Structures are given as structure tokens and as C-alpha cells.
């Protein structure tokens, strides 16, 4: 019930009246760029992204300069391999670096902000990136329904003065 309410509120926020336009959106939980074969493979992830030809991508579970991924900034690798522009938000410090979410976009954002989100099991974040014709939000929501509900007014407040179409994508758990 609470999850349905959360999703309903997000639906209303995302589909406010707007001018018709097409934006190809991909949401991809990349699991630290580790495949089912337990190997880090940034090219494999980049190929999946490129094959879908998105305008914008919400990425979850990105390592940035951690021991686990041998000091590589995963989003930076994906930027190089896809030719897209990256925006990163650390959610938690992790193994000498950080772990978080990101956006890959064809356009460079005009501006962006990072909003902390509730997360009992680990801290969560929301990236709000403004582009010429729209605003894009990327997130990786908490596993707990209570935290998901607590996130709704934070998202609503952060977007209350936006006068462009708003799109939101991510791992909503």
C-alpha cells in the first residue's frame, strides 16, 4: 500500500502538463560494472547503453575510486566509452573512495544539485539535473517502504519551482 502511494506521487510529479517532446531514457543498475561472470567490464556496460541510444541514463551502484574496483572512477570510464557527459553523486564513502549514482547525458547539464535521501540500510541520494528543455532526476531509493515515503516530500520540495518537464528514473526498489 505504502509503495503504491509512493509510486503514485512520483507518477504525478513526473507527468505534469508539458510540451510534447521525446526523450529516450534508460535506467540501469550496473552493480558496480561487475557482470554475472564476476568480472569488471566497463565496455560491456557501455555497449548496452550505446545499443539503446538513450538521450539520458540514470545509473545506480557506481564505485568511484574504491579498492574494490582498483581505483577506477566507473562513471568516468563509461563517459569515455559512450561519448556521453557524466554527473556523479556519492551516496556513501566506501573503500577509500565512494559509492553512488550517476547520470550520463548527451547534453551537458546547465546545472545540477544533489539531495540526500532517506536510507536506513545506507545513505541514498537524488541528482536533479537541469537541461535546456527538461529536468532529469536520478535516484536509487531505499529498500524500506518507510524511507521511500519519507523521500516523497523531499523530492516534491526540491522540484516545486521547476517550470520545465520533469523526468525521473532510477532503482525504486
Per-segment meaning from a language model:
Residues 150-173:
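Metal-dependent phosphoesterases centered on the DNase I-like endonuclease/exonuclease/phosphatase
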Residues 137-155:
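Active-site-proximal segments of metal-dependent phosphoesterases and phosphodiesterases across multiple
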Residues 22-34, 113, 128-142:
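Active-site-proximal beta-strand elements of phosphoester/diester hydrolases
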Residues 58-60, 87-90, 167-171:
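Active-site neighborhood of phospho(di)ester-bond hydrolases with catalytic His/Asp-centered motifs
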Residues 5-13:
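Sec-dependent signal peptide hydrophobic core
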Residues 31, 63, 142, 172-173:
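Catalytic metal-binding/acid-base residues of hydrolase active sites
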Residues 37-38, 62-134:
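Structured beta-strand-rich core segments of catalytic domains in phosphoester-bond hydrolases
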Amino acid at each position: 500500500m505504502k509503495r503504491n502511494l509512493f509510486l503514485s506521487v512520483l507518477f504525478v510529479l513526473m507527468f505534469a502538463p508539458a510540451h510534447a517532446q521525446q526523450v529516450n531514457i534508460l535506467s540501469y543498475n550496473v552493480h558496480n560494472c561487475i557482470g554475472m561472470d564476476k568480472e569488471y567490464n566497463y565496455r560491456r556496460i557501455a555497449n548496452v547503453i550505446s545499443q539503446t541510444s538513450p538521450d539520458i541514463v540514470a545509473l545506480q551502484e557506481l564505485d568511484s575510486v574504491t579498492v574494490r574496483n582498483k581505483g577506477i572512477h566507473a562513471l568516468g570510464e563509461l563517459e569515455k566509452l559512450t561519448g556521453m557527459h557524466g554527473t556523479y553523486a556519492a551516496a556513501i564513502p566506501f573503500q577509500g573512495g565512494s559509492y553512488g549514482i550517476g547520470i550520463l547525458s548527451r547534453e551537458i547539464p546547465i546545472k545540477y544539485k544533489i539531495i540526500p535521501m532517506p536510507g536506513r540500510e545506507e545513505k541514498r541520494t537524488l541528482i536533479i539535473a537541469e537541461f535546456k528543455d527538461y529536468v532529469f532526476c536520478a535516484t536509487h531509493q531505499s529498500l524500506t517502504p518507510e524511507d521511500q515515503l519519507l523521500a516523497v516530500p523531499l523530492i516534491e520540495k526540491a522540484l516545486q519551482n521547476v517550470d520545465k518537464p520533469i523526468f525521473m528514473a532510477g532503482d525504486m526498489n
